[in-house]
From Swiss-Prot:
Any one GO cellular component localisation term in the record: cytoplasm
GO MF: kinase activity; metal ion binding; phosphoenolpyruvate-protein phosphotransferase activity
Note: The reaction takes place in three steps, mediated by a phosphocarrier histidine residue located on the surface of the central domain. The two first partial reactions are catalyzed at an active site located on the N-terminal domain, and the third partial reaction is catalyzed at an active site located on the C-terminal domain. For catalytic turnover, the central domain swivels from the concave surface of the N-terminal domain to that of the C-terminal domain.
pH dependence of function: Optimum pH is 8.
Name recorded for this polypeptide: Phosphoenolpyruvate-dependent phosphotransferase system
NCBIfam families, sorted: PRK11061.1 (NF008283), PTS_I_fam (TIGR01417)
Amino acid sequence: MLTRLREIVEKVASAPRLNEALNILVTDICLAMDTEVCSVYLADHDRRCYYLMATRGLKKPRGRTVTLAFDEGIVGLVGRLAEPINLADAQKHPSFKYIPSVKEERFRAFLGVPIIQRRQLLGVLVVQQRELRQYDESEESFLVTLATQMAAILSQSQLTALFGQYRQTRIRALPAAPGVAIAEGWQDATLPLMEQVYQASTLDPALERERLTGALEEAANEFRRYSKRFAAGAQKETAAIFDLYSHLLSDTRLRRELFAEVDKGSVAEWAVKTVIEKFAEQFAALSDNYLKERAGDLRALGQRLLFHLDDANQGPNAWPERFILVADELSATTLAELPQDRLVGVVVRDGAANSHAAIMVRALGIPTVMGADIQPSVLHRRTLIVDGYRGELLVDPEPVLLQEYQRLISEEIELSRLAEDDVNLPAQLKSGERIKVMLNAGLSPEHEEKLGSRIDGIGLYRTEIPFMLQSGFPSEEEQVAQYQGMLQMFNDKPVTLRTLDVGADKQLPYMPISEENPCLGWRGIRITLDQPEIFLIQVRAMLRANAATGNLNILLPMVTSLDEVDEARRLIERAGREVEEMIGYEIPKPRIGIMLEVPSMVFMLPHLAKRVDFISVGTNDLTQYILAVDRNNTRVANIYDSLHPAMLRALAMIAREAEIHGIDLRLCGEMAGDPMCVAILIGLGYRHLSMNGRSVARAKYLLRRIDYAEAENLAQRSLEAQLATEVRHQVAAFMERRGMGGLIRGGL
């Protein structure tokens, strides 16, 4: 038992979060002691009560907390006496307190030991069993020893922080989708949790194979159904997410390992948990953003499989009339199941700004915050305000604050209406300068076509999306059809196709790349120049697709040096000759440019001018590389800021050099459509802004209400700032003076 005890302590100590540590503890104690129930009650001395924080065997109700006063129940008695209590039949003890919601009436044997550190009671550790018996001395000694070890791992500061969640009223988080929402918080009690699945075996593997097969089929049908549903509307980005889910679900290796686990004697639920977690951990251990997000996708798949394995979850859910979803994690499938006419906001404990769930809430226009460090159960059925602009969550707000946010929501609705009135007008400054508003495309062609009259062309088409949704490299013919559709859709406007940009944040399932530091590794143009056959096939497809329209711009991603540009141009010229030989006539020459996202190229602009026709500044990666920060890492995401003075000075230098050397300058990335950044970019000299479709209306509204001189003045003052907060204060004041403060916060 000593070895087992050491293993449990090491696993608990290495858990990244207290809740995870407690779940590991109760699970491993049940396995080690061969007992049916293990629970941890932690003491909140401010409220003089215990919280049931983790259990295996009892029914811990979703969406609310289970508490016991210090003077209640046998658990309370263990704490008051500060010594173990070992009972053969706990229900006959005068201190026994029945709690219907946890379903413990089946269990008779009870052993509870206090968790004490430096004379301070931290909690009570309990095991229970149906059998009428006292736990023997070795079992009691084992549990007492574990409680002592737990006391050393736990600290009062940890518990104070944990229980502080129940009293928090304002919680900082990451803004994931703009907007303001007010409603009751709601945790979905029907969603199965992976941590609630425990190891269990079966004597009928054939039955478990049948159950697993059924769950896989149900999930596949579900993903196809959601894909068709969203494809039928304007949400093509969302449809593409479910296509990717279907692709992951059909992975041969994943299915093989699931059935292998069942064949070893595991029940289907345990097979799903072990295999999905193994795959997800492999992805999560890698450092690049895209692979980390795929770990979340795999867990979402696992959750859906567990859902379809549980017959009890197949009934309808009683959603409130208006609610804000609160969850530990969020999947696109969960969002798709929710009644869209009732869902007004989302709060997620874990999540990245570029996860599929984040993409989807932005596409649906649902105000969302992620990285809110609070348990969802604490927020269930409480009045919440989600501020997706500031990245704030307000819990049980005072009436005055509630009234103020309700006013902001009304004004936000009016502002959206005003912006839509301008969307079909040209993006022209008050001083007369014409700004080109371009579209970042690649996920939703039908929706993009609807924006055709509102934009000046496609500033960035992400060609990697079709590559990611297939089980192998698309053929040249398939690519021709794909690109032809986009070039013809906007045949009177420039269309910029970016060559394959994979690696690091975007991986192909059939071309896995494992590196210690993938963000600085084999990605973008580095891959396609090392694999010229991939590059040549893609460029030939682009040139063939452009033969009839002549509006093609080719964009090279992740360029680090001039020799990469030279080699890429050489291959493009070769592809052009091959296409002309194939079709027998001369084809239009495309314009060739680079995505400026690596800091080294900022200093090479005079030499680039002789090699490229245009430059498109990719602000997302350029910000990350200049600041050396991963914006999807919640620990450092607050450092990521495109308005950092160093970033602004880099943008100013790029604009200045581009003007001197006559380079056609463009900008894409989140800055291009961010109302907090647009005026500064205009003042710095940027005239081509490429943004996501949802940003077009508000960007045009802003542009038509400023003139160049005042934008230039704002940009110059921002360049003199020393901190990003100074810049933001300047922009906020600038916007408020012009009656456009509502574009950067709630309200008008």
